Amino acid sequence: MEPHKVVPLSKPHPPVVGKVTHHSIELYWDLEQKEKRQGPQEQWLRFSIEEEDPKMHSYGVIYTGYATRHVVEGLEPRTLYKFRLKVTSPSGEYEYSPVVSVATTREPISSEHFHRAVSVNDEDLLLRILEGGHVMIDVPNKFGFTALMVAAQKGYTRLVKILVSNGTDVNLKNGSGKDSLMLACYAGHLDVVKYLRRHGASWEARDLGGCTALHWAADGGHCSVIDWMIKDGCEVDVVDTGSGWTPLMRVSAVTGSQKVASLLIEAGADVNIKDKDGKTPLMVAVLNNHEQLVQLLLDKGADATVKNEFGKGVLEMARVFDRQNVLSLLEEKKKKMPRKSSVH
C-alpha cells in the first residue's frame, strides 16, 4: 500500500472578505483544499483565524477547526480590524497568511437615532435622517409616542413643522389615546397648538378617558392656550365620556386654579353643571379643599343649595371631610342668602 504522501505547506492566501456589516465580518478561505479532502479528518488541514489586538500588537485565536468560513461578530461600527489565517498540517507543520485589514460599516440609522434627534432638538440630524429615507416617520418610541408627539410636548416648533411637512400623521394617538394636540395644550406650547390646528388636528378627539384637548389644557393651566382654544371654537363645556366632567370640573378636581376657572367662566362655562353623579364644580372644589376656588365659584353664582344624586349638599360634604376653612365660607354664604318662605 502506498504511504500517505506528505505535501509541504505553502504560504496560504489571506482570508477572503465576505459580507461586512456595522457589527460583523464574514471571512472564508482555502476553497481549493476543501474540494481535495479525503480520508479521516485527522488527515485534513486545520484552520485558525487570528485577530490582532491593536493595543498589544499581538494576535489571538478567534476560530480554529476544519471549516472554511467564519463570521466574526460583536464588533464596533466604523472600526478597522486585522486578521490572518493559520494553516496547520496533520504533522503539526503550520504557515501564516498575509494579514487582511477590514473596516466595519457605519451603524445604520434606526428609529432610536430618529427619536434621539427629536428628543434633543437636533434639527440637522433629523433632516439628515429624513432625507436618508431609512426610518418610518410615524414609528413610535418605546413609550408609544411618535416623534411629533414628543416634539409637540417639548415645544420644538421647528421640528414639529419639519415632521408635518414630511408627512407625519397629526392625529395619531399614544397608548392612553392622547394625540399631539392634547400634549401641546397640556404643556402650554401655543405656537405648536396653532400650527397643529392649521394642519388638521381636531378639538373633538378624545383620549381613552374620554377627555378632549381643552380638558388637558385646563389641567396644564396655561391661560394663553386656553383663551386661544376657546376663540378658535373649542366648546367650553365639553363633557368627558368617563365622569361627565367639563374643563371647569377638571379645574375643581385637579389644580384649583382661579385664573383658569375665571377664564372658563368668562367664556360661558356653566358653574352649576352636574356630572354623572350629580356633583357640581362647587362640590368638587369643596371635596378637594380648593378654598380660593370655592370663593370664586360662589362669587360667580354657584348654587350652594343643590344636592347630588345621593342627596348630599356642599355643607354636608365639607363637614364630613372636615374642610373647616371651606365650611366657614359656605356658612358665611348661607347667612347672606335670602331665606325662602316654607310651609311647616
Curated annotation (Swiss-Prot):
One GO BP annotation of this record: positive regulation of DNA-templated transcription
One annotated Gene Ontology cellular component of this protein: cytosol
Pfam families: Ank_2
Entry keyword set: ANK repeat, Cell projection, Cytoplasm, Cytoskeleton, Nucleus, Repeat, Ubl conjugation
Expression sites by tissue: Mostly restricted to testis (at protein level), including mid to late pachytene spermatocytes (stages VI-X), diplotene spermatocytes (stage XI), meiotically dividing spermatocytes (stage XII) and spermatids in steps 1-14. Highest levels in late pachytene spermatocytes and spermatids in steps 1-9.
ANK repeats: from-to residues: 109-139, 143-172, 176-205, 209-238, 243-273, 277-306
Coiled-coil stretches: none
Chief place where the protein resides: nucleus
Subcellular location: Nucleus; Cytoplasm, Cytosol; Cytoplasm, Cytoskeleton, Cilium basal body; Cell projection, Cilium
KW Cytoplasm (keyword) present: yes
SMART domains linked: ANK (SM00248), FN3 (SM00060)
PTM comment, free text: Polyubiquitinated. Polyubiquitination leads to proteasomal degradation.
Assembly mode: Interacts with COPS5; regulates the phosphorylation of JUN and the transcriptional activity of AP-1. Interacts with RYBP; may prevent the ubiquitin-mediated proteasomal degradation of FANK1.
Function: Through the activation of JUN and AP-1-mediated transcription, may regulate apoptosis.
Domain notes: The fibronectin type-III domain mediates interaction with COPS5 and RYBP.
Protein name as it appears in the record: Fibronectin type 3 and ankyrin repeat domains 1 protein
Organism: Mus musculus (Mouse)
Gene name tied to this protein: Fank1
